[in-house]
């Protein structure tokens, strides 16, 4: 049975209601059947429509343009041309995609006839529309399987390379992948079981570029524009293609227990140990005198948690991490915060974006609250009634400052508190703001005033 939406209803192919009908529980139950409950490699032909893939291609180009203009190498952008990794990326970033270019036009301008490959990790940080659409598509499967230990990550692949620049390789243990193939060209994935992938003495087993002798022992999967490809964890694999294509790999990221214990310790350090460069002196004290370590221990910002043991502290870190994942629809990486300081008018409509939900809880410290918004933990003080406001926003109904302030008992400061809260939530992409006609008129007037001032100057 096809789950493609009725063409007559699909004025906006990326409408969230359409995506929900298209990738509903029945679709994902069929996915689980085809993949043997996510244990078998499989191509899913009943996927995205051509219109949806074209829109997603545009979103990916916009991501590449944003990275090229603002972030550049900050988020692990890698480029290969004619089989060689490019170390100096500034000339490439200067040729970023333009708004009026499709993927064929841009790649012809940026690369000509050369073979190239781009890999960008943490793709979920960038395009809000692409991340939102993918989150809605994936929402049912997360309810079925639970939250992966370290959530969901995206890797963006763009290129016309003959084969993956990484050679025959395995991804990190515990990462099973759902590949959204956006085309336009097809791609073929070769997959090996450990016992079938036999390397010669002295031959590299991981990142093996000696591909030809091993293709016959691999399982081959070819997928086309709009199709999905699923690969379980811990598989040797290699992607090959002759034509240009874009792929969005969604990773369900689980970890082994030892590695995740290390991750919790890393998070404990990041949250509780501020940077310091104070130099220590040689310790002249007797062997049992540990007083010299006090300046070191005082660096830890534990406040009223100093008497807690290691395990309770790490459990607290894990709970915060879970709240972050659930507030971000499972995404491992939070979106890039907005930099504009928005002025929310009294009649502007404010609401959350589906399928994201904020989480509010009372901090153990009296009068303190924590709000988890799109993976970011925000701590607030003296905000009785905050839980009610978050619950109302999570309902998805647009609300004004006055309506939200009416939920608080503090009549004098309610509107001021709500306006501050909404500005913080907007900064971390927890809410969207639809300006009222009055706000739009003021904004238009400001633009005219700035234009006249600039002209006079």
Language-model features and meaning:
Residues 2-33, 210-218, 222, 238-457:
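Fe(II)/2-oxoglutarate
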Residues 50-57, 124-135, 307, 311, ...:
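Generic detection of long, well-ordered alpha-helical segments
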Residues 228-229, 233-238:
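Histidine-centered metal-chelating micro-motifs
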Residues 1-89, 394:
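An N-terminal JmjN-like helical accessory module and its immediate linker preceding a catalytic domain
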Residues 41-43, 117, 228:
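Residue-level preference for the first positions of well-ordered beta-strands
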Residues 29, 33-34, 50, 69-225, ...:
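Active-site region of the double-stranded beta-helix
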Residues 45-49, 123, 374, 436:
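Acidic/polar N-terminal loop/beta-strand segments that form early-domain functional surfaces
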């Amino acid at each position: 049975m096809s789950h493609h939406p009725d063409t007559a209803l699909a004025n906006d192919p990326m409408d969230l209601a359409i995506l929900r009908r298209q990738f509903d529980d029945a679709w994902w139950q069929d996915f689980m059947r085809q993949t043997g409950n996510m244990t078998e490699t499989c191509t899913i032909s009943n996927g995205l429509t051509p219109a949806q893939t074209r829109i997603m291609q545009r979103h990916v180009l916009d991501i590449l343009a944003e990275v090229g203009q603002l972030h550049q190498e900050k988020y692990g952008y890698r480029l290969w041309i004619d089989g060689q990794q490019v170390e100096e990326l500034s000339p490439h970033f200067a040729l970023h995609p333009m708004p009026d270019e499709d993927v064929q036009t841009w790649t012809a301008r940026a690369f000509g006839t050369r073979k190239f490959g781009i890999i960008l990790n943490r793709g979920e940080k960038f395009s809000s529309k692409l991340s939102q659409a993918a989150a809605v598509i994936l929402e049912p499967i997360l309810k079925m399987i639970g939250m992966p230990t370290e959530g969901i990550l995206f890797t963006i692949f763009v290129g016309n390379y003959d084969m993956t620049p990484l050679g025959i390789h395995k991804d990190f243990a515990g990462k099973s992948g759902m590949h959204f193939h956006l085309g336009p060209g097809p791609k073929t994935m070769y997959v090996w079981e450990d016992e079938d992938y036999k390397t010669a003495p002295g031959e590299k087993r991981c990142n093996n570029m000696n591909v030809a002798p091993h293709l016959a022992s691999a399982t081959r999967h070819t997928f086309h524009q709009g199709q999905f490809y699923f690969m379980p964890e811990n598989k040797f694999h290699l992607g090959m293609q002759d034509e240009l294509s874009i792929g969005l790999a969604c990773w369900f990221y689980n970890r082994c227990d030892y590695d995740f214990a290390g991750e919790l310790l890393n998070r404990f350090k990041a949250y509780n140990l501020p940077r310091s460069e104070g130099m220590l002196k040689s310790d002249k004290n007797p062997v049992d005198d540990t007083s010299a370590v006090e300046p070191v221990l005082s660096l830890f910002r534990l406040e009223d948690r100093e008497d807690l043991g290691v395990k309770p502290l790490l459990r607290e870190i894990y709970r915060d991490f879970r709240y972050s994942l659930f507030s971000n629809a499972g995404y491992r990486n939070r979106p890039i915060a907005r930099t504009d300081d928005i002025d929310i008018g009294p009649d502007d409509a404010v609401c959350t974006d589906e399928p994201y939900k904020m989480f509010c809880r009372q901090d153990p410290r009296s009068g303190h609250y924590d709000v988890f918004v799109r993976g970011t933990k925000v701590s607030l003080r003296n905000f009785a009634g905050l839980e009610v406001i978050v619950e109302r926003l999570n309902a998805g109904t647009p609300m004004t400052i006055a309506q939200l302030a009416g939920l608080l008992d503090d009549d004098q400061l309610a509107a001021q508190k709500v306006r501050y809260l909404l500005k913080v939530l907007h900064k971390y992409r927890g809410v969207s703001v639809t300006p009222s006609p009055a706000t739009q008129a003021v904004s238009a007037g400001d633009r005219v005033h700035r234009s006249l001032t600039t002209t006079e100057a």
